[in-house]
């Protein structure tokens, strides 16, 4: 099971290799496992946040662009994607839904200027073996004041891996607008964890 493999991996170079080998089947697997994040994002953007279609969006940890297809269907067109896997980005590029794609790790300083995105989405990324809580500060840095950061965080790592603490540390920069009820991210995969969707708003 690819899911078990990637979430138990501790080496970033091996993780990159796993995604290289998984890239061509990723969308098929996500679809068959009932990937919940696209639906969750659709609900947030349709019911909770009524944002202009022209806003500048960052899809952080975009992978193949599977979740960003929701943005495209909702007529958001100004989307930048970042991912550390060139193979996943090749799939994303073929969908022609991104204005710009960048290959880099979110665990490092992001090569983008501060305060430029009105919306950042980050789903299925802030979890074990992938991107740690230290990335939150960098993502908030490139978010515009009054901009929104929508992310999913697995229940199993929220406290244990320091995400709760890091969000508290950012209290002078962001406020928590809402936290969803816990849901199973991949209902048709026995190795899937429960997650919640967090909406943070940048203060200044």
Give the ranges of each region predicted by the language model.
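N-terminal, positively charged/glycine-rich alpha-helical extensions of SAM-dependent methyltransferases
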Residues: 1-24
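Class I SAM-dependent methyltransferase SAM/SAH-binding core
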Residues: 58-109
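A short glycine-rich, Lys/Arg-flanked "PGG" loop and its adjoining helix->strand segment in the class I
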Residues: 134-145
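Conserved beta-strand signature within the Rossmann-like core of class I S-adenosyl-L-methionine
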Residues: 146-154
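Conserved Class I S-adenosyl-L-methionine
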Residues: 162-182
């Amino acid at each position: 099971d690819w899911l078990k493999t990637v979430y138990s991996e501790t080496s970033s170079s091996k993780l990159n290799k796993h995604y290289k080998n998984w890239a061509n089947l990723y969308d098929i697997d996500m679809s068959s496992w009932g990937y919940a994040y696209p639906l969750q994002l659709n609900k947030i953007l349709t019911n909770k946040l009524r944002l202009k279609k022209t806003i500048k969006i960052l899809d952080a940890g975009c992978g193949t662009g599977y979740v960003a297809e929701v943005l495209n269907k909702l007529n958001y067109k100004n989307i930048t994607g970042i991912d550390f896997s060139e193979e996943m980005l090749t799939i994303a590029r073929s969908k022609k839904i991104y204005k710009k794609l960048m290959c880099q790790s979110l665990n490092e300083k992001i090569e983008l200027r501060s305060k430029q995105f009105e919306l950042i989405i980050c789903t299925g990324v802030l979890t074990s073996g992938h991107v740690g809580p230290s990335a939150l500060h960098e993502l908030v840095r490139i978010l515009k004041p009054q901009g929104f950061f929508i992310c999913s965080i697995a229940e199993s790592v929220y406290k244990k891996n320091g995400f709760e603490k890091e969000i508290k540390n950012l209290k002078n920069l962001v406020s928590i607008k809402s936290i969803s009820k816990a849901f199973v991210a991949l209902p048709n995969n026995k190795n899937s964890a429960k997650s919640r969707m967090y909406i943070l708003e940048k203060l200044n």
